[in-house]
Amino acid sequence: MKHTTLFFAFIFFTTIVFAQTDFKGEVATAKKSYTSGKLEDAHFALQQALGDLDIIIGKEVLKLLPTQLDSLNANTNSDNVTANVGFIGATIHRDYGTPEKKAEIEIISNSPLLGTLNAFLNTPLIGGMLRDENNKTVKVQGYKARLERTDAGNGKFNYKLDVPFSSSLLTLSVDNSTESEILGMANKIPFQDVAKLIQ
């Protein structure tokens, strides 16, 4: 448990440090390092610049997301974009509502989970074996998605929808909800516009 906590703390702080660099400055450093033959420094500066670019794109994606899902207003003060560590991409987060009734959108560009989720969605044997009353495959705006239901313990259900699109994974989570409500919310998300921006 101690090792897991330390690992996640390291990832968190590395992400924050990685996210605080300057795009134009890193590109200038990369050019200067390349011209002087310091290829390792040029490579590092370009990686930093790509991380900055992912954050800039993530902030533009937040502008595309709806300010309201059903009756839940966006809590834009908690909007967050962080650079992914270890691979290129960003995690984009927005939540809606109040603690009593909330929804969350997370978009992970270049998600490492895409391969597994696509295998689940596109292989009938695997998808069929893992399907039950709490898991099923649905379509949202033409994209296959995995819908998962968990008991909220109060006679209601929490839903989670995983939608792989382009090279990204969007997860919509809604507490105390119904299947029709979460699918209605998902249909308000501009997947095509987000996909064009993230590519």
Regions found by a protein language model. Give the residues of each.
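A short, solvent-exposed beta-edge/loop patch
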Residues: 20-31, 35, 45-47, 133-199
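Short, solvent-exposed recognition patches
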Residues: 64-150
